[in-house]
Each structure stands twice: as structure tokens, then as C-alpha cells.
């Protein structure tokens, strides 16, 4: 029984990995059909549906992986790092680095891969980025409590500016067909971003 569960779990992971790889390839700029995905995995469409009731559930699983990966690591950053600017830098670097290591998932994070899918999938990605922006805003607000001084501009504006930088770098990554890495020149860009906060 346990062996059967492991086989099923492995097949599910294989399907999700194939979908992520297709999103990374030139197929990712077009709608990915279950027929194409099944052919890529080497199974029938019926076999796909034994593991996932719909393509939407496949995307849900990939979004869940993105959410878990980012939120878990952001929480670790907030737990381990207390200095405001280091927290912000590490969170941005996390988002950019995750995208760089997972190009196919970057198409989901930017919404490119979801254009032909159910609206609620884009809603989940929107909620993820809203949560990240909220965490950035909280880090900025805690700076005032911790250091006794705030920022020249409103924390909401600053948090959205930082997140917009990340989103722009992810879009550039896709537009360049994954040639322009999101973390490229980050060490040069960070002081420019940090200067905007003061």
C-alpha cells in the first residue's frame, strides 16, 4: 500500500516537474494543453487525470509550492535577521533568487502562464504578492519602533516600490527568455533601492 502511494506521489511530482519545464521552454509562452503535457510526460491524458482532476489543480500545486517556498523562507529571514535594511535586502534577494532558480515558475509568478487559465489562479498569485508586500510594509514599520525613527515617505509607498522592483526584474527575466538573471547586478542595485528609503 505504501509503495503504491509512493508511486502515485512520484508520478504527481513528475507531472508537475514536466509542467514547470514546459513553462520554462518556448512552450511556456503559449497555452499548455493537457495533450502536450501528457505527451511530454509519456502518459495518456487519462493518466494525467488519475493524478489531477484538472489542469487547474496542477497549477494550484505549483502555486502552493511557490507560496510555501517563499513564505517559509521569509519567516526565517524575519526570525533570524533583526536589522531592517538586511531584512529587506534578503527578502528581495530571496524572491529574485527563487525566480532565477525556477524559470518556469516565474511565468506563473508574473501571471504570464495563467493568462489562459482560470481567473482564481491569478487571484492566488495576487494574494501571494499582497502578503509579501504586507510583510515588507511591516518590516518598514518595525524600523520606526526599533530605531525610534521612521522614513521620509509612507511605508505603504516604500513597500510597493520594493515589490515593484522585484516584479519588474521577473518580467525582464521572462522577456529576455531567461537570459537576464533577476539577481544580476543586485549588489549594485541594492544601495540605489536602499537610498530611496531614507
From Swiss-Prot:
Please provide the record's keywords in A-Z order.
Cell cycle, Cell division, Coiled coil, Cytoplasm, DNA-binding
User: Which segments of the protein form a coiled coil according to its record?
Assistant: 117-144
Q: Which residues form the signal peptide?
A: none
One cellular component (GO) term of this entry: cytoplasm
**HAMAP family named in the record:** NO_factor_SlmA
Cite the record's note on assembly: Homodimer. Interacts with FtsZ.
Q: What is this protein called?
A: Nucleoid occlusion factor SlmA
Q: From which source organism is this entry? A: Pectobacterium atrosepticum (strain SCRI 1043 / ATCC BAA-672) (Erwinia carotovora subsp. atroseptica)
